[in-house]
């Protein structure tokens, strides 16, 4: 509370000139960034993660990752100021509407493709006007490990999972930080080369360092 008074009527917020009051507050951790660790654990054979600074009743739309991943083998327990992730049986993700959490779509497309889930995705309209056309980018890169994101009717997409995994995959990141991070869990199944890995610096500069801490070996190639 910074001491600012306002009025809110229908879709209008009125704030008169005022002086802010200094206060201290704690910023919640980023659920978008957390989603990649949900995905990594879902694709891994074993393990647990504890993610600090995440709240159970978050206002962030991407906190929906908890519910989504409960269908893909991740049990979430909120405790000690964060969330403990543990593996559980995959029940299956039949469909999901990403209208209110579009930044999760790339992560879930890759996860479903790796886990053998034929899932239906809707609410992806905004993905075409993000850092890149993320629909096109996903289709191009999923194909590299024999998976698909197929538009079965206007704005309705089906993830068709990979049946065979190549020994190596080279991922083009399209100057899009989320393309690099979303495809990182593929490293649990095969060797992955990322073009322009520094693209993650836009939102998560320590991403590759945290991958190392999570057991993913990385090497810079000239």
In which residue ranges do the predicted regions lie?
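Short, structured segments at the rim of ligand-binding sites
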Residues: 1-222
């Amino acid at each position: 509370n910074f001491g600012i008074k306002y009025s809110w009527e229908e879709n209008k917020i009125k704030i008169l000139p005022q002086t802010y009051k200094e206060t201290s507050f704690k910023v919640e951790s980023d659920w978008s960034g957390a989603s990649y660790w949900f995905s990594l654990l879902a694709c891994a054979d074993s393990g647990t993660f504890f993610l600090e600074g995440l709240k159970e009743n978050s206002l962030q739309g991407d906190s929906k990752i908890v519910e989504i991943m409960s269908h893909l083998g991740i049990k979430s327990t909120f405790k000690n100021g964060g969330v403990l992730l543990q593996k559980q049986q995959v029940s299956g993700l039949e469909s999901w509407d990403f209208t209110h959490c579009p930044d999760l779509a790339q992560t879930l497309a890759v996860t479903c493709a790796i886990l053998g889930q034929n899932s239906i995705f809707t609410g992806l309209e905004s993905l075409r006007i993000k850092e890149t056309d993320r629909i096109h980018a996903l289709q191009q890169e999923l194909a590299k490990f024999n998976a698909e994101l197929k538009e079965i009717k206007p704005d309705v997409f089906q993830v068709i999972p990979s049946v065979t995994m190549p020994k190596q995959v080279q991922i083009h990141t399209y100057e899009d930080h989320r393309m690099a991070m979303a495809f990182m869990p593929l490293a649990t199944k095969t060797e992955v080369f990322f073009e322009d890995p520094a693209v993650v610096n836009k939102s998560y500069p320590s991403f590759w360092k945290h991958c190392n801490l999570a057991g993913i070996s990385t090497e810079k190639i000239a």
